[in-house]
């Protein structure tokens, strides 16, 4: 496992605490606007993903990239998780990884 550039697990609410840092999240693709992917985070926030165009609409997509202001992420890696993804466990993981269990995560 490469730990040289760890990515924090974030949902829409937690994303704003990591501006300028590498993050990992999952969004459900909703639409594309001018080369940007607009998606819904696992906790219901609307996120703008730069550099992730081409994702199938309604699919869940894992995004690893750099958090930017205004609920945006500059994508480095995008992985299509398909339509059958339960967002609740990932959202719970984000809360644990940034709350009471954060010492267990990079």
From Swiss-Prot:
Transmembrane segments: none
Pfam family, one: Rep_fac-A_3
GO BP: any one term: DNA repair
Disulfide bonds: none
Cellular location(s): Nucleus
Domain of life: Eukaryota
InterPro entries: NA-bd_OB-fold, Rfa2
Coiled-coil intervals: none
Primary location group: nucleus
Keyword Acyltransferase: no
Role: As part of the replication protein A (RPA/RP-A), a single-stranded DNA-binding heterotrimeric complex, may play an essential role in DNA replication, recombination and repair. Binds and stabilizes single-stranded DNA intermediates, preventing complementary DNA reannealing and recruiting different proteins involved in DNA metabolism.
Record-given protein name: Replication protein A 14 kDa subunit
Organism, scientific name: Oryza sativa subsp. japonica (Rice)
